[in-house]
């Protein structure tokens, strides 16, 4: 689904320069035309926005860029298809979830998205085997604006920022309205430095319930 068909489109168009949005469209067209090994599939670039409409967004989980191996990236941060082994960061997310709330078998986090969890990467495309290769190319003004749009919306939300990169996006969030949860990244390099034991899932639900919003069924 193209960006223009999502519920986020009017707010994005109001916030960003039309010339920049044209450059985004051109980048997508040229990148996928020139290289067949770009992830996720072109139709899934904006999957997070498609599956989590702005009015239904309750939680935002920031990622950096898509998984760069074949068959992994879905357009949802940290998620992989059901039949794909969980990458190390996702293994640790599920480990913390099990300790915090309970065990979840599925590696596919689509059901989180459809409950109002925006699984947003800061960079929306990646070439095969080249992590962060598209960082700084085109995407950040758009994804930064999406964080701002979610923050400017009045409904109380939880923003989950794992690691220094995600935490650099804190500047776009109005903490008088929303809860920001920060910890180390779930990567094996840092998970034992504050990610494990941080209880983001139960803390998010506690906030949502306190604000009169439906909690997330993280085990679904």
Swiss-Prot record:
Its EC number is 3.2.2.27. It is an enzyme of class 3 (hydrolase). GO terms for molecular function: uracil DNA N-glycosylase activity. Disulfide bonds: none annotated. SUPFAM superfamilies: Uracil-DNA glycosylase-like. GO terms for biological process: base-excision repair, AP site formation via deaminated base removal. The keyword Cytoplasm applies. One of its GO terms (cellular component) is cytoplasm. It is found in: Cytoplasm. Its main location: cytoplasm. NCBIfam families: PRK05254.1-1, PRK05254.1-2, PRK05254.1-4, PRK05254.1-5, ung. This is Uracil-DNA glycosylase. It comes from Leuconostoc mesenteroides subsp. mesenteroides (strain ATCC 8293 / DSM 20343 / BCRC 11652 / CCM 1803 / JCM 6124 / NCDO 523 / NBRC 100496 / NCIMB 8023 / NCTC 12954 / NRRL B-1118 / 37Y). The gene is ung.
């Amino acid at each position: 689904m193209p960006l223009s068909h999502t519920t986020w489109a009017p707010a994005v168009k109001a916030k960003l320069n039309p010339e920049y949005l044209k450059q985004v469209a051109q980048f997508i067209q040229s990148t996928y035309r020139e290289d067949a090994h770009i992830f996720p599939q072109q139709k899934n670039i904006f999957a997070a926005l498609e599956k989590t409409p702005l009015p239904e967004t309750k939680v935002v989980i920031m990622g950096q860029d898509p998984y760069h191996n074949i068959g992994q990236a879905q357009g949802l941060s940290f998620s992989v298809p059901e039949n794909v082994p969980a990458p190390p960061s996702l293994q640790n997310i599920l480990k913390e979830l099990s300790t915090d709330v309970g065990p979840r078998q599925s590696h596919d986090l689509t059901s989180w998205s459809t409950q109002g969890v925006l699984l947003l990467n800061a960079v929306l495309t990646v070439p095969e085997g080249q992590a962060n290769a598209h960082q700084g190319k085109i995407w950040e003004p758009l994804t930064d604006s999406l964080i701002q749009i979610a923050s400017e919306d009045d409904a109380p939300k939880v923003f989950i920022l794992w690691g220094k990169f995600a935490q650099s996006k804190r500047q776009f969030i109005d903490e008088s309205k929303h809860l920001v949860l920060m910890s180390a990244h779930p990567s094996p390099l840092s998970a034992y430095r504050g990610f494990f034991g941080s209880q983001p899932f139960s803390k998010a639900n506690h906030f949502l319930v306190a604000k009169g919003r439906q909690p997330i069924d993280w085990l679904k």
